[in-house]
Structures are given as structure tokens and as C-alpha cells.
Design a protein with these regions (language model features):
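Conserved PLP-anchoring active-site segment centered on the Schiff-base-forming lysine
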Residues: 102-120
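A glycine-rich helix N-cap at a beta->alpha junction
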Residues: 126-137
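Glycine-rich helix-loop-beta junction characteristic of Rossmann-like nucleotide cofactor-binding loops
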Residues: 76-78, 101-104
């Protein structure tokens, strides 16, 4: 029997990844729409660039709003596994190219479906062939 005092999965997901000690105790984390973040001094900047703090530097790298969403999606998708993460990208091609670039090396061969998405086809058959010598079938 479920413990009536433990939160439901819906409640856990609604608040997963949110740190109530941040953002002045806001019940709902703010939406960060800025692209750049400031630092109090050079040591703070160095720590951020060395990734010791997980502080945002530039929105395409780390954004607090995006990071919370990634943590929620990872928790939903991975159940009890805590070693997996989710990444959000600004576009489908950003996601496709990130996965492909992570998975291949110069001179590799990629097998793709015949009717692959047009921009993906261009990325594979033009950019990767020219820049990395990757062949595509």
C-alpha cells in the first residue's frame, strides 16, 4: 500500500531538479531568457569556466531553466538510473548533429535511411564528407 504521506510521482516531477534555496525561495523557478550571466570576480569566472560550479556562463552551454527541464526529463525517462542525463537543444538539427558528432571519428562511415531529413542529408553528405572525410551510404 502506498504511504499516504509520500508525494506522488506527479508531485515529484513537478518539483524535481528545483532547488528552493536558490532564486530567493521562489515557489516556481524563474524563466531565464538572458544569454549571458555575470560574475562577482575573476575567481568566480575561473571556477565557472573550469566547470567546478555548474554556474551558467552562456545560455547555449548552461541555462538554469533548461537545466531543470533536462533533469525532469531524465528522471522521467530513466526511472531508477541516476547515471543518465537529458540534453535539450535549440533545434532538431542541433540534436542530430550533436549525436552524430559524438558518435563518429574522421574517416568513419555512416549508414542512413534513404529518405533521411534533408538538412541531415546535407550535413552528412556535404559538411562531414568535406570536413572529416566521413562517407555516407
Amino acid at each position: 500500500m502506498k504511504d499516504p504521506h509520500s508525494p506522488s510521482v506527479d508531485t515529484l516531477m513537478a518539483h524535481f531538479g528545483e532547488d528552493r534555496t536558490m532564486y530567493d525561495g521562489a515557489v516556481v523557478p524563474p524563466v531565464f531568457q538572458n544569454s549571458l550571466f555575470t560574475f562577482k570576480d575573476w575567481d568566480d569566472i575561473d571556477a565557472a569556466f573550469e566547470d567546478r560550479t555548474r554556474r551558467p556562463i552562456y545560455t547555449r552551454l548552461i541555462n538554469p531553466t533548461t537545466r531543470i527541464a533536462e533533469q525532469k526529463i531524465a528522471a522521467l525517462a530513466t526511472a531508477s538510473r541516476t547515471d543518465l542525463e537529458a540534453r535539450l537543444t535549440a533545434s532538431g538539427m542541433a540534436a542530430v548533429s550533436a549525436v552524430i558528432l559524438h558518435s563518429i571519428c574522421a574517416g568513419d562511415h555512416v549508414v542512413a535511411v534513404k529518405n533521411v531529413y534533408g538538412p541531415t542529408n546535407n550535413f552528412l553528405n556535404s559538411y562531414l564528407r568535406e570536413k572529416m572525410g566521413v562517407e555516407t551510404t
